[in-house]
Amino acid sequence: MSERIQKLLAAAGAGSRRGIEEWLRDGRLKVNGQLVKLGDRAEPGDRFELDGQVLDTGGPAAGEAPLVTAVLLYHKPTGEVTTRRDPQGRPTVFEFLPPAPSGRWVVVGRLDVNTSGLLVFTNDGGLAHRLMHPSFEVERRYLVRVRGAPGPELAERLRRGIQLEDGPARFDRIEPQGRSEGHSWYQVTLSEGRNREVRRLFEAEGHEVSRLKRLAYGPFELPEGLTPGKSWVVPGLELEKLLAGLKTAPNLR
């Protein structure tokens, strides 16, 4: 299933989405030997070139045996970015990962620099696509802290849905988790991954998010005891069981 080029390459860690959009505007990118422009789409298995140099997007090189799928869970602390390189010199999550058993790690569903919690990595581009594309409706679960003491009507409005600048948005589930020291806590679930969507939903209702932590992504949960900055490779048999529950076909409603 095709995806916008900047989204595919950003997910593979080739650069920031904004930076990749600049490459497209400047005519520096080719896909399968053809020059592409902003707005064009590509498949995860396509060949990408920047200024004539092939970009490594995590798949096997020509002639190599197919990859054995691996998944790594990382507890991202705040302050780290999810690109391979950062022009501002900030630490990137890739600096703290062990080598992939084959191929290289691709991040599934980025987190912004001020968000902590679960990051999923895989060396399988097809699996990454299934986990990220909205048509597969993979749930993401977060713990959110907002300033103040919103009334119960806030949860109801965000469950029904509101209009953001890039279209309607809503939480599939939103559950109050109590209050402490001038803040209110919620656990929220949604099945798409638009840029800063959790923060923007609350901000659209006048409530600033002061802390955001991802707890789960699809079948993967942040392991108990996995401290910030640490990672864990899911064992093969456990991974097989977890992936068995994934949708194998997109919802095309």
Please give the residue ranges for each predicted region:
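Basic, flexible Lys/Arg- and Gly-enriched helix-loop patches that mediate nucleic-acid binding at interfaces
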Residues: M1-R253
